[in-house]
Each structure stands twice: as C-alpha cells, then as structure tokens.
C-alpha cells in the first residue's frame, strides 16, 4: 500500500512538472522563454538619485555608468531616478543621460513629483525598444506612503517579443 501511494505521489510530481515554453498572463500577454543557449543579462540598480556614489552626496552619473558598463547587461532596471530636480540638476534627466553615456535606449516612468521635477523608475536597453508602458502604483489609503511606478518595455530578440 505504501509503495502504491509513493508511486502515485511520484507520478503526480512528474505530471505537474511539465515544461511549457510559453504561457499567457491574465492580460493575454504571452511570456516567451528565449532560445536555449541565448543569455540575456538583466541588472537592477537602485541609484538613489545618483547621490550614493559621491561622499558629498552630489549626483555622479559617470560613476554609475562605469558600474553598469563593467556588468555589461542587456537591460538595466533603475530605481529612484531623478528627472529635472533641484537636488540633481534642472537640466539632468538621469535615465536619458545614463542611456546616452552607455549607448542604450531608455524609458522612464514617473512615480511622484519631487523637488521641482520628477522621481520614478526607468529601464535601459541595448536592444531597440518597440513599445513602452508606465503604470502608477498608488499606496492604499489605509497604508499611506510614497506612490511607486512600474516601467515596462517590449523589445524583440531573435524574432520573439520580450517584456522587461
């Protein structure tokens, strides 16, 4: 009897571990697994408004660009990005300026107004960006705090759509 139960349990585990290369999410978007052998490097980086790289707390995009360059990612997701703020410069768009230093494309998603400018998240891409989406993620009234954002891009790699 124990042997039969163990065999059924093993069969259930094997059946539940089937490998489906594609699936649809609740919006009908298809997630694509890249072809075997293709490595895609994704880096996430909380840049703290680019202030954490300098002892004087001044924005240092060159230092951030060097950190990213050494990792050689295909995509970089950035958190705490300043755009035209007083604290990091009214002419500084951190996502745009970092992308230019790295030869990448970019998309910025605003979360909130901050210090005379905007503050949010961004994605940098070595691959041409086909589509961009931005989502505001407001805090619940019962749990007040700082609103967040979600930044999504669509690129094509080897003839397949990839969302980052």
Named regions from a protein language model:
Residues 128-162:
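Active-site catalytic loop in hydrolytic enzyme cores
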Residues 11, 70-72, 126:
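Alpha-helix termination/capping residues and helix-transition junctions
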Residues 100-101, 117-132, 156:
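Conserved beta strand-loop-helix elements of the APE1-like EEP
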Residues 4-14:
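Sec-dependent N-terminal signal peptides
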Residues 17-106, 112-121:
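N-terminal, active-site-proximal structural segment of metallo-dependent hydrolase catalytic domains
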Residues 1-4, 19:
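Positively charged n-region of N-terminal signal peptides that target proteins for export
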């Amino acid at each position: 009897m124990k042997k039969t139960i163990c065999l059924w349990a093993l069969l259930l585990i094997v059946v539940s571990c089937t490998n489906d290369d594609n699936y649809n999410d609740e919006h009908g978007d298809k997630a694509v697994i890249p072809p075997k052998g293709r490595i895609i490097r994704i880096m996430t980086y909380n840049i703290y408004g680019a202030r954490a790289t300098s002892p004087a707390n001044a924005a240092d995009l060159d230092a951030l660009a060097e950190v990213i360059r050494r990792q050689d990612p295909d995509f970089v997701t950035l958190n705490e990005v300043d755009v035209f703020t007083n604290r990091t410069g009214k002419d500084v768009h951190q996502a745009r300026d970092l992308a230019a230093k790295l030869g990448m494309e970019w998309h910025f998603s605003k979360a909130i107004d901050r210090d005379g400018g905007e503050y949010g998240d961004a994605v940098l891409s070595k691959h041409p960006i086909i589509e961009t989406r931005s989502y505001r993620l407001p805090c619940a009234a019962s749990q007040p705090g700082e609103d967040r954002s979600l930044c999504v891009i669509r690129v094509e790699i080897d003839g397949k759509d990839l969302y980052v």
